[in-house]
Amino acid sequence: MKEAVNVGVTSTYSVTEAVAQRRSIRAFLAQSVDKDLLRDTLVQAARAPSGGNLQPWKNHLVVDQRLVDLKQMMRERTLDSFQEDTVDYDVYPKPLSEPYRTRRFRAGEDMYRLLGIGAEQKAARRQRFRDNFQFFGAPAALFCFIDHNMGRPQWVDLGMYLQTVMLLLKANGLDSCPQESWSLFPKTVSSFLGVADEEILFCGMAIGYADPDAPVSALVTERAAPDEFIRVHA
């Protein structure tokens, strides 16, 4: 079995390096991840900014046999049909306007190109989407919830928390993939985890060591030119 090098808690990554090297990984090694390291990461990330110090994030870490059970349940759930739950929020605006539509399309096509899956291969693309619900083979998974009564500012807090989690993971030699695709199955996941009805599932996250030999691991999505998102007023 292939193994990655575990950088460990003594990592000397700078913040700049962690930001530059963090990517959404969609192929993981089976190598297990230290649960104490994962828990410590979630604790450390709680220093993320939070308006009014509300700290609205609620985390569920799934590993070992419980993750095996979840993957099997979702394999059966998505095998023949794809009947999602009633969703709590739309991942993208409808309709998605430019330039956002083109950015999303290009990222998807770049990924499928690396996988060798053409636009006409609909079944292969559907199967690739199902891989989301196997966490791309990752040995650890995170689900993040937020109370129904929280507003947009608290959702921003949640995003800052998750970014901090991912940077800390990267600084400790781990990779991740935030997955809003799990928002399609909020009731299914909540029932599996025993989460209260008043909480919304925001996303899942695959966590583990990237498979360096997988073609999709070479994916680096483009970023817009600075002039598209920065205006300096002086």
Range-by-range predicted roles:
Residues 1-234:
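Acidic, surface-exposed loops and disordered segments
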